From Swiss-Prot:
GO biological process terms, semicolon-separated: alkanesulfonate catabolic process; nitrogen utilization; uracil catabolic process
Binding-site list for FMN: I49, K50, N115, E124, R140, Y141, S190
One of the Pfam families matching this protein, by short name: Bac_luciferase
Transmembrane segments: none
Known catalytic reactions: uracil + FMNH2 + NADH + O2 = (Z)-3-ureidoacrylate + FMN + NAD(+) + H2O + H(+); thymine + FMNH2 + NADH + O2 = (Z)-2-methylureidoacrylate + FMN + NAD(+) + H2O + H(+)
Entry keyword Mitochondrion: no
Gene of this entry: rutA
Molecular function via GO: alkanesulfonate monooxygenase activity; uracil oxygenase activity
Family (UniProt): Belongs to the NtaA/SnaA/DszA monooxygenase family. RutA subfamily.
Organism of origin: Acinetobacter baylyi (strain ATCC 33305 / BD413 / ADP1)
Protein name, UniProt field: Pyrimidine monooxygenase RutA
Entry-linked InterPro entries: Luciferase-like_dom, Luciferase-like_sf, Pyrimidine_monooxygenase_RutA, SsuD_RutA_monooxygenase
Length: 369
């Protein structure tokens, strides 16, 4: 089972709460997190793209780094961990992204991959005059299909003459080409999104569901399998969870309750309003899950709260879900969270014993000695 870290490229990570750690994103912060993640055997690091935040008292995601330049920097200061940036495909031409990806492939010596997103929050793009109108919601996967086909052509052959509804290439060239196969991630939970991933992605990115219900998302894997049976492709799942861990279940749950008590209502209302504007994609999209009123304080991602032992056991449950190749983790406190994962959680995971054998966890007794 692969483990990844979802880099806090935006302020305050993934908690819309006045009671959560408040911090600004920086290269130094992300470098520290990813280097420590690499030390503990994390397999990959992924950063999102966000061009406008949600406001509120915490100014949630109003402050964001840029994903490609950040991950290029991280590629240069790491040696083993896989690095993924995210392409905002509405504002980044595919030929430019193909060349940027090839460059980071060179920096990382073949450790780079790409997450592609269609875009869902209109103000991110309308502020630049680049939102194509709400009719885009109905055709965004057709747009992304053309985009990915061009990427694959350029990476494989260095040249594209692709002609489609949205893009027209005329002897477009990219060289040098990537030295390693470029893996593509796409988030899909609706049937349309899953069908797209089955056709074009290497990994399908989904949200975990609920509080301490680690296997509740498993039905998405079954639906993805339905579509991959039709395409004949092997597409595995990367699933997102937040970890809030402590010495005891009670301590961890108290932190979770505090974050909920301090929820940034204004920022949450912005999220819910924007998430409801796509009326074309159905009720089962990842955006609809993000904007749900059930647990908006951490955008409704699956949440694992408990003692180190309990969290380790729940992560092992996820590892048993057929079709899941990796777990992407966020933490309430990223710096401490990565350390706690490496020292206190991962050594207890049956599914990660091969990784633990490669480094020496420092026991609590040794820490205090």
């Amino acid at each position: 089972m692969k483990i990844g870290v979802f880099c806090p490229i935006g302020n305050n990570g993934w908690l819309l709460s006045e009671n959560a750690p408040q911090y600004m994103p920086s290269f130094e912060l992300n470098k520290k997190i990813v280097q420590r993640a690499e030390h503990y055997g994390f397999d990959f690091a992924l950063s999102m793209i966000k061009l406008r935040g949600f406001g509120g008292k915490t100014e949630f995601w109003d402050h964001n780094l840029e994903t490609f330049t950040l991950m290029a920097g991280l590629a240069a200061v790491t040696s083993k961990i896989k690095i993924y940036a995210t392409a905002a495909t509405l504002v980044m031409p595919p030929a430019i992204v193909a060349r940027m990806a090839s460059t980071i492939d060179s920096i990382s010596n073949g450790r780079f991959g790409l997450n592609v997103v269609t875009g869902w929050q209109a103000p991110e793009y309308s502020q630049m005059g680049m939102w194509p109108g709400d009719e885009y919601f109905a055709k965004r996967y057709e747009y992304l299909s053309e985009y990915v086909q061009i990427l694959r052509e350029l990476w494989a052959t260095g040249q594209s003459d692709f002609k489609g509804e949205h893009f027209q290439m005329e002897d477009c060239r990219v060289s040098p080409q990537p030295q390693a196969e470029m893996k593509i991630i796409c988030a899909g939970q609706s049937d349309t999104g899953l069908e797209f991933s089955a056709q074009h992605a290497d990994y399908n990115f989904v949200f975990g569901k609920g509080l301490n219900t680690p296997t509740a998302y498993a039905g998405i894997n079954d639906r993805l399998k339905h579509f991959t049976d039709q395409t004949g492709r092997d597409v595995q799942t990367y699933v997102l969870f937040m970890v809030i861990a402590a010495e005891t279940d009670a301590e961890a749950m108290a932190k979770w309750q505090s974050y909920n008590d301090g929820a940034d209502v204004e920022a949450i209302n912005w999220l819910m309003n924007q998430g409801g504007k796509d009326t074309k994609s159905g009720a089962d999209t990842n955006i609809r899950q993000m904007a749900s009123s059930v647990s908006p304080v951490n955008i409704n991602m699956g949440t694992l709260v408990g003692s180190y032992e309990k969290v380790a056991a729940m992560l092992d449950e996820i590892a048993e879900i057929k079709g899941t190749e990796g777990i992407l983790l966020t933490f309430d406190d990223f710096v401490q969270g990565v350390e706690d994962f490496g020292e206190r959680i991962q050594p207890l995971m049956t599914s990660r014993q091969d990784i633990v054998a490669e480094y020496q966890p420092v026991t609590p007794l040794e820490k205090s000695a």
